[in-house]
Amino acid sequence: MHAASREALERLEQTLDQGLNETSDKVGTGVNTGTELFDVVELLDSDRGLRVALIDPARDTNTRVELAKSLFGGKVSASTEEIVSAAVSQSWSNTRDLRDGLVKLGRLALLRAADAQGQQDRVEDELFQLARIIEREPELELKLADRAASPDARRDLLAKVLYGKVTSTTEALALQAIGRLRQRPVEELDSLVDEVAALEGRTVARVRAAAALGEQQKSTLSDKLEKIYGRKIAVHSEVDTSLLGGAVIRVGHEVIDGSTAGNLRRLRASIA
């Protein structure tokens, strides 16, 4: 996202947070605003002329705002209308940045609602585990990544996988990401995990362990990693019995291989 667009997004995040903090129903308003912003983006994705008109610098701000109100007024909640109107009054580098910005705002609204319910950490972990499930099911990922299938078809497929297993926030975030793919499904979901963690100022540590980690083990590992990296760390783990023992930890692009399998590979390499 270009500089002008980043500045616009920062202002809109403040507008969104202010509105959510002032409402008596933060959960309901956050959920409605988030899902409605996703719907707005879907409309903009399908209409190039509209998205160009809404950021056209040749049109004055009032004209762009009135256009947005004529399209969405009475069809979305007051909170969503306020965000969309504020968005089109900003300067965006291109239409893609506008749409990506609205997606981020939709996600933020949903996550603020989840946080108000004490569910943000759960959402983060559910997204991580969902990514791992899809990663282990190549046929499922292939179907979810099929650009020949409509966004609705991909969402319907994932909805069947998710039904009754995750929070409504996790479901809404995952379905939106799968319906609007920019990269592989697993990568989309992993990006979401990073985004959720970043709201709490945390960096994600992805751990593959030979045996399931208990909460105390995760907490101890998190403390150690925080001392190494000098920032808050969110530990998410999965079981990989092929490691034989120990664990492999990935933080960003850095990998710490403390697994038995890794030690054996290094030993063989040194002997060879």
UniProtKB/Swiss-Prot annotation:
Keywords tagged on the record: ATP synthesis, Cell membrane, CF(1), Hydrogen ion transport, Ion transport, Membrane, Transport
Domain of life assignment: Bacteria
Keyword Transcription regulation: no
Subcellular location: Cell membrane
GO terms of molecular function: proton-transporting ATP synthase activity, rotational mechanism
Gene3D superfamilies in the record: N-terminal domain of the delta subunit of the F1F0-ATP synthase (1.10.520.20)
GO cellular component terms attached to this protein's record: plasma membrane; proton-transporting ATP synthase complex
InterPro entries documented for this protein: ATP_synth_OSCP/delta_N_sf (IPR026015), ATPase_OSCP/d_CS (IPR020781), ATPase_OSCP/dsu (IPR000711)
Disulfide bond entries: none
Keyword Repeat in record: no
Chief place where the protein resides: membrane
PROSITE patterns hit by this protein: ATPASE_DELTA
Topology relative to the membrane: Peripheral membrane protein
Function: F(1)F(0) ATP synthase produces ATP from ADP in the presence of a proton or sodium gradient. F-type ATPases consist of two structural domains, F(1) containing the extramembraneous catalytic core and F(0) containing the membrane proton channel, linked together by a central stalk and a peripheral stalk. During catalysis, ATP synthesis in the catalytic domain of F(1) is coupled via a rotary mechanism of the central stalk subunits to proton translocation.
UniProt record similarity statement: Belongs to the ATPase delta chain family.
Assembly and oligomerization: F-type ATPases have 2 components, F(1) - the catalytic core - and F(0) - the membrane proton channel. F(1) has five subunits: alpha(3), beta(3), gamma(1), delta(1), epsilon(1). F(0) has three main subunits: a(1), b(2) and c(10-14). The alpha and beta chains form an alternating ring which encloses part of the gamma chain. F(1) is attached to F(0) by a central stalk formed by the gamma and epsilon chains, while a peripheral stalk is formed by the delta and b chains.
Protein's name in the database: ATP synthase subunit delta
Gene name of the record: atpH
